[in-house]
């Protein structure tokens, strides 16, 4: 039985020539007399630092105390690039990063409620509010407490409920020190304190 013919390995010389061809500039002839086709690499441009407005610089330096600021007067400060928030509400001056958030906010001032519940006709400013509302009609309660199993139609109601298990009472009365799990309970409690006359 004959052994199959094996290929001879190419010598290193042609590879070196190929490498030499790549290094030549377009239009110049290679060692074989052919024109080079690869363009030389352009040097990378230095990265531009963001240009800060005088207001931005003042805002940055306000964070330092006056003596520290004097030490660095005229020294450029690098601040990571932050996208401006170009959408400002004409009514209240509130600024938004995204156009869609600005449009949604405008409905607060116009009173527009373009989203309607199919079952009862109630209208809402946001589509997500309709989705939450429709759970009243369907009886869906997708938010379940891991401790006791009680279910809720709204995630915020589950968070409020979980405070009954943790004992968390973050809302404290400044007058008597009594604490409450819910802000509404604190507001109700404050009404029981006699008002101070100034």
UniProtKB/Swiss-Prot annotation:
Function: A putative DNA-binding regulatory protein associated with meiosis in spermatogenesis.
Tissue expression notes: Predominantly in the spermatocytes and spermatids of testes. It is also expressed in the fetus and embryonic stem cells at lower levels.
Chain's gene name: Zfp41
Record lineage: Eukaryota, Metazoa, Chordata, Craniata, Vertebrata
Biased composition (Basic and acidic residues): 13-31
Entry's Gene Ontology BP terms: cell differentiation; spermatogenesis
Location of the region described as Disordered in the Swiss-Prot/TrEMBL record: 1-56
Cell cycle found in the keyword field: no
Localization per record: Nucleus
ZnF C2H2-type: positions: 87-109, 115-137, 143-165, 171-193
Organism: Mus musculus
DNA repair keyword on record: no
Record's protein name: Zinc finger protein 41
């Amino acid at each position: 039985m004959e052994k199959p013919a094996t290929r001879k390995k190419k010598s290193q010389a042609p590879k070196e020539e190929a490498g030499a061809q790549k290094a030549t500039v377009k239009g110049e002839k290679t060692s074989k007399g052919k024109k080079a086709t690869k363009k030389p690499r352009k040097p990378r441009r230095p990265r531009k630092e963001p240009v800060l407005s005088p207001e931005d610089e003042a805002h940055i330096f306000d964070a330092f105390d006056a003596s520290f600021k004097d030490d660095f007067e005229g020294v450029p400060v690098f601040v990571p690039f932050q996208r401006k928030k170009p959408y400002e509400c004409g009514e209240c001056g509130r600024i938004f990063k995204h156009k869609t958030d600005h449009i949604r906010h405008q409905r607060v001032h116009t009173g527009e409620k373009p989203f309607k519940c199919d079952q009862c006709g109630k209208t809402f400013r946001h589509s997500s509010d309709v989705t939450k509302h429709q759970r009243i009609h369907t009886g869906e309660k997708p938010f379940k407490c891991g401790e006791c199993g009680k279910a809720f139609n709204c995630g915020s109601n589950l968070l409020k409920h979980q405070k009954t298990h943790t004992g968390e009472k973050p809302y404290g009365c400044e007058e008597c020190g009594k604490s409450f799990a819910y802000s509404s309970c604190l507001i109700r409690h404050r009404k029981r304190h006699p008002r101070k006359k100034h």
